[in-house]
């Protein structure tokens, strides 16, 4: 069931709720862990994240596809909407990560993210490789992504559901979402290739990566064992040194997150059609 080609430490602490409150346990290195659940379209992420959340007592944060104003447009005219949609999704996923991080700090509780700001790159890179995002547009995207990632910790755990693209296509056809029916196999295969590169990146960053063969789904209890039988470091390989600073207070970090969320509300670049190098029609932000 499991392929462990990219494997390292995950928490073996079965007690998911810390006893101490923020006021008494206020050092950054007392975080509960952050898990990101990744995989191709229709790999089974949402179902598994919900089940793991229930069993671990973790809060689940879903990706913002339900409110994506560009998704159906992208599937119909990918070259027109690729960059603007990826910048919108990058912004939304960053905001979701900030919310999850703040929740974990305030509640001393682990969190699971169904996709993340980290894996947003997979979709952008796939669009770039297919010629849907120009080199200049991709450079712009990466500059935004780098800025976002510099403000957040690296996830403790990266769970990847490894599903053959043909199987993903079959599941897409079976769930019959209108906006997805035009997705070609080549697009899913491209995402699969980009995800493999992404996992190497996450390993190099210091996240704890487990690859799960999910072609026939799997036993959730075995997934739990994989998580609980390993150890994890708090943010020892973080993008930002403050997550490793034992003297940095949780309340200060929460304040930093709030400030960043407020800053994000003021950012309009992700909807700025003037910077879209694919000559998209102007959409009001």
From Swiss-Prot:
GO terms for cellular component: cytoplasm; mitochondrion; respiratory chain complex I. The keyword Nucleotide-binding applies. One of its GO terms (biological process) is deoxyguanosine salvage. The lineage of its organism: Eukaryota, Amoebozoa, Evosea, Eumycetozoa, Dictyostelia. Belongs to the DCK/DGK family. The active site is at 114 (proton acceptor). It is found in: Cytoplasm. Substrate binds at residues 63, 75, 86, 115, 120, 180. InterPro entries: DCK/DGK (IPR002624), Deoxyribonucleoside_kinase (IPR050566), DNK_dom (IPR031314), P-loop_NTPase (IPR027417). Purine-specific deoxyribonucleoside kinase that phosphorylates preferentially deoxyguanosine, as part of the deoxyribonucleotide salvage pathway. It holds the Pfam family dNK. One of its GO terms (molecular function) is ATP binding. CDD domains: dNK (cd01673). Keywords: ATP-binding, Cytoplasm, Kinase, Nucleotide-binding, Transferase. It catalyses: 2'-deoxyguanosine + ATP = dGMP + ADP + H(+). This is Deoxyguanosine kinase. It comes from the Eukaryota. Its main location: cytoplasm. ATP binds at residues 39-47. It is an enzyme of class 2 (transferase). It comes from Dictyostelium discoideum. Its EC number is 2.7.1.113.
